[in-house]
Amino acid sequence: QGAPLCERLDWDSRFFGVSIARAVPSRVDLLTRDAILDWCRAQGIDCLYFLADEDADTMRVLEDAAFSRVDDRVTLELQPIPPASSPHADTRAACQSDIAALRKIAAVSHHDSRFYNDRHFDRGRCDELYRVWIDRSCQGWADHVVVVERDGNAVGYLTVHLREPHAASIGLVGVDRTYRRQGIGAHLMDGALAWISGQSVRRVWTATQRRNVASQGFFQKAGFRPTGRAIWYHRWFSPSTGAAS
């Protein structure tokens, strides 16, 4: 028995109400692809996620078997971490009382993600996914959540996860639409990097959508540089199950 080709995603399956798994390899040949498909059918999988390297042979093999390309992913990295500066007065760590406001922002801030780009997923559930995501992040799933406060309310967030060894990743970034273009993103980033600089972290990475030029520009302005590209595919086995209503 070699390494498993797929892993079932219990949380995703419960949330969306369909059986979801993720492929482990990032490159496949014809035989490996067919073994993955056989496993999914035997396990009753409805949807398979596949994060593929930007490899022509892998892409062709997947697309020949009805894998749908739902996102082109860009990875960006910051290394070394710049010296910490004092956080802005409006920037602080998230607290319980911020969650309601952050959930509202999250529901409308991530429409470029692969879930919205797959019509099998109901858009209302996608909105709820990001509400839950920021909620869980504030409850400890993320190692740190930075917020900017204006007029007594949190109007933006940025989540940070510590990775081993000596690395961190930035997850979600969102700003209330009525407060955009006011420098809030820069304050969030400064607050995040100030916290990260005290955590023995040597590099920070993030991933965003290739079509999301604004997001890439935000990170590049902070000193991040592109380091890799990959492609998210979804393969549905039961098109009518979990389809958006």
What are these regions (language model features)?
Residues 25-97, 230-235:
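Acyl-donor-binding surface of acyltransferase catalytic domains
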Residues 1-8, 14-16, 78-97, 239-245:
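Conserved N-terminal entry element of GNAT/NAT acetyltransferase domains
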Residues 42-54, 167, 196-208:
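Conserved GNAT acetyl-CoA-binding A-motif
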Residues 44-46, 70, 125, 135-146, ...:
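A short helix-loop-beta-strand connector motif used in the catalytic cores of GNAT acetyltransferases and
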Residues 55-69, 182, 186, 198, ...:
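Conserved active-site alpha-helix within GNAT-family acetyltransferase domains
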Residues 28-38, 172-175, 181-194, 198, ...:
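Conserved acetyl-CoA-binding loop-helix of GNAT-fold acetyltransferases
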Residues 1, 142-159, 176-179:
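Conserved beta-hairpin
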Residues 18-27, 87-124, 245:
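Short amphipathic alpha-helix that is part of the acyltransferase structural core
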